[in-house]
Every structure is written in structure tokens, then in C-alpha cells.
């Protein structure tokens, strides 16, 4: 017996998404949480109680997100050299393509540098990885969004 369902014909006018609850981005490479510091520096820390690791995600469109520090109010950004930094206001450098991979980890690719495949990445020592040094398949680019 086959059950069929009617196609959904309603349209929903929803505002640009905000993932409601803050998240932590846990990197599988070295066990670091992505941290956005007040001085504009971005790195990783293993300290789960660090206030600078609480992040708010905002969807610009499907699969495109801004990542903002709850503590500093700054946005994660990647410059033209592939360096991660904190920006005071959202810009093109702050948009990332969020993708759920087959291994259930998320990756965040710079939209501005999508043609170069530059990802957000954290090295085992907690320092950020240059976008130009990242590529698909590296543990440094795999993140688990966790509840605060």
C-alpha cells in the first residue's frame, strides 16, 4: 500500500533566520571552541566557560550565515589574505556558507572567497588557520555547533 501526501501550497513569510539560541562552535581538531575576542583576534580555546565563545548565528539566506559574538557584538570575518578577524559590523567578509557534511560536522566557507574554497579552520594549537591553507577533508575545518 502506498500513501501519498498533498503538496504543500502555503507560503510562509519568515524573517531572516536567527538561530534563536546561542551556540558554541567546537572544532574536532584539538578540541577547541571558536573564540572572538574584543581586540579583534579570533582563535580557539578549550575553556568551555570562556564568555567569548558564545556565538549567535544569523541567516542571510539559505546556507549563508553571519556569526556574531554575544559578548563582544563583533562578527567573524575573513579578509582577502584568508585571515580570520572580528569585524564591528556585518560586511561581505562576514558571510559564510554553512554546510552540514556527511560526517555530521559543519563547515563554514567564506562566501567572498568561495571560488578559492577558503574555510574557517582552527589548528591543533588553537590558532586560526589561513583560509588559503584549508581544504576539504581537513579536521581543522570541521565544527560541531553545540548548545551553550
Swiss-Prot record:
Plays an important role in the regulation of cell survival, cell division, angiogenesis, cell differentiation and cell migration. Functions as a potent mitogen in vitro. Acts as a ligand for FGFR1 and integrins. Binds to FGFR1 in the presence of heparin leading to FGFR1 dimerization and activation via sequential autophosphorylation on tyrosine residues which act as docking sites for interacting proteins, leading to the activation of several signaling cascades. Binds to integrins. PROSITE patterns: HBGF_FGF. GO terms for molecular function: fibroblast growth factor receptor binding; growth factor activity; heparin binding; integrin binding; S100 protein binding. One of its GO terms (cellular component) is nucleus. Keywords: Angiogenesis, Cytoplasm, Developmental protein, Differentiation, Growth factor, Heparin-binding, Mitogen, Nucleus, Secreted. PANTHER family: FIBROBLAST GROWTH FACTOR (PTHR11486). It holds the Pfam family FGF. GO terms for biological process: angiogenesis; branch elongation involved in ureteric bud branching; cell differentiation; fibroblast growth factor receptor signaling pathway; mesonephric epithelium development; positive regulation of angiogenesis; positive regulation of cell division; positive regulation of cell migration. Heparin binds at residue 29. Gene3D superfamilies: 2.80.10.50. Residues 123-139 are annotated as: Heparin-binding. This is Fibroblast growth factor 1. Belongs to the heparin-binding growth factors family. The keyword Lipoprotein does not apply. It comes from Cynops pyrrhogaster. The lineage of its organism: Eukaryota, Metazoa, Chordata, Craniata, Vertebrata. It is found in: Secreted; Cytoplasm; Cytoplasm, Cell cortex; Cytoplasm, Cytosol. Residues 1-11 form a propeptide. Its main location: secreted. The keyword Secreted applies. It comes from the Eukaryota.
Amino acid at each position: 500500500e502506498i500513501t501519498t501526501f498533498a503538496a504543500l501550497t502555503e507560503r510562509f513569510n519568515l524573517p531572516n533566520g536567527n538561530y534563536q539560541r546561542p551556540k558554541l562552535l567546537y572544532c574536532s581538531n584539538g578540541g577547541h571552541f571558536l573564540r572572538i575576542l574584543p581586540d579583534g583576534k579570533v582563535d580557539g580555546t578549550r575553556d568551555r566557560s570562556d564568555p567569548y565563545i558564545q556565538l549567535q548565528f544569523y541567516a542571510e539566506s539559505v546556507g549563508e550565515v553571519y556569526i556574531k559574538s554575544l559578548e563582544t557584538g563583533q562578527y567573524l570575518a575573513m579578509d582577502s589574505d584568508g585571515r580570520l578577524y572580528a569585524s564591528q559590523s556585518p560586511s561581505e567578509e562576514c558571510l559564510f556558507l554553512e554546510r552540514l557534511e556527511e560526517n555530521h560536522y559543519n563547515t563554514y566557507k567564506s562566501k567572498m572567497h568561495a571560488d578559492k574554497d577558503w574555510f574557517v579552520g582552527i589548528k591543533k594549537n588553537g590558532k586560526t588557520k589561513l583560509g588559503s591553507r584549508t581544504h576539504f577533508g581537513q579536521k581543522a575545518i570541521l565544527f560541531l555547533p553545540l548548545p551553550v
